[in-house]
């Protein structure tokens, strides 16, 4: 475990322990993962490296580790990570996967990036994602698609596909992601890794390029629940001066309750998550996971989330509406792409946005502008907000009967790249099980629980009540202590 050939098979917790014991250096570790990431560039997971910055951070971590004599160093000191390119970073490009921001370099770091850096994380680079985090297949990036390491002809999921693929391929031990309607959980499921979206407001959105401001949330992606707990502890905390939606709650140690028994835990199983449209292979893997949780002492409770089907139209009204507002700032005036030739200011706006945005982003801007327009606001946007409240109420009714909700992450395993053709509805329908929790602002996570057709990974989704991340991580950790699915590795990596 102390040789460079095995470094990429270590979890964050294992690697951090070796670094603190000085059995491996941060510099050696950074060089090893940089070499792996660059050697597997065809995966499409990375968008940018800055080797000078990465190695400088690693050397600084080694000096801090050498100077420590009382064990007071940050837990993650020297651990390498990369960030989804939706977080702005001072020393790396910040493109949001869009031609609109091609080559853009931010003058500051996102709060999540700063918090992880304060805990000693070494930044390896920036990771590919769907343009402005809009997509379920990571095919919408202006810089090319990401490939699933389990089958290079298939999607890794989206929009945090680069993060999920890089972790699954052992190009790095962990990565940041963002989740608006399932963009951490779905790619985690498709790539066989563990990922968690915390309660809305747990992690600061400052420095996250905004898609839908009432839904966007940052979270970690790693191979184990223990690693996610370590990372989430570092990422969360109040940021009142820079993010008004940040919760005024102190940072929490999510590792503290990982090993608690789940004996007697009530796990709600929503009937609506197991109906028509759920593939048999996914159903079998999820059913197997639920039976394993029963063996660990949990009790399965049938519940209902009656407005599950409404989550798709509600989400695809609210999220595009917020996107149309947020993306109005990209007009070619102050930063980002600007059309080379134009007749006047209005023409410059039109050509800049036509050239800079991809098809899916344009589609959502148009939908959002339409539902916010005079005469349609009440009929669409206001109505969607009312139903959103009802969806949140459905969850609160369910939690009167259970402690945690469990079900599939997606109706199918990862599909072929280009498999949905030019049918955006097919991508939208793939989010049906992740959207309800997102609309309610609840924490949710995905953990690998088996394989479906063509030996593609399947994830189990856990959804907790507000601020119950520790409970989700506890359930996931106990499951992973009893099973081996999270240890599976794609061939060739």
UniProtKB/Swiss-Prot annotation:
Transferase as a keyword of this entry, yes or no, is: no
The main enzyme category here is: ligase
The family database entries (PROSITE patterns) matched by this protein are listed as: AMIDASES
The UniProt entry's GO biological process terms, in alphabetical order, are: translation
Q: Name one Pfam family in it.
A: Amidase
User: Which reactions appear under catalytic activity for this entry?
Assistant: L-glutamyl-tRNA(Gln) + L-glutamine + ATP + H2O = L-glutaminyl-tRNA(Gln) + L-glutamate + ADP + phosphate + H(+)
Can you list the GO cellular component terms from the UniProt entry?
Answer: glutamyl-tRNA(Gln) amidotransferase complex
The EC number of this protein is 6.3.5.7
Q: Which GO terms describe its molecular function?
A: ATP binding; glutaminyl-tRNA synthase (glutamine-hydrolyzing) activity
What residues make up the catalytic site? 84, 159, 183
Keyword Ligase (UniProt) = yes
Highest taxon above the source species: Bacteria
Q: Which UniProt keyword terms apply here?
A: ATP-binding, Ligase, Nucleotide-binding, Protein biosynthesis
Under InterPro entries, the record lists: Amidase, Amidase_CS, Amidase_dom, AS_sf, GatA, LisH
Which family does the record assign?
A: Belongs to the amidase family. GatA subfamily.
State the protein's purpose: Allows the formation of correctly charged Gln-tRNA(Gln) through the transamidation of misacylated Glu-tRNA(Gln) in organisms which lack glutaminyl-tRNA synthetase. The reaction takes place in the presence of glutamine and ATP through an activated gamma-phospho-Glu-tRNA(Gln).
Q: Do you know which HAMAP family this protein is assigned to?
A: GatA (MF_00120)
Quaternary structure note:
Heterotrimer of A, B and C subunits.
Protein name listed in UniProt: Glutamyl-tRNA(Gln) amidotransferase subunit A
Q: Organism, per UniProt?
A: Albidiferax ferrireducens (strain ATCC BAA-621 / DSM 15236 / T118) (Rhodoferax ferrireducens)
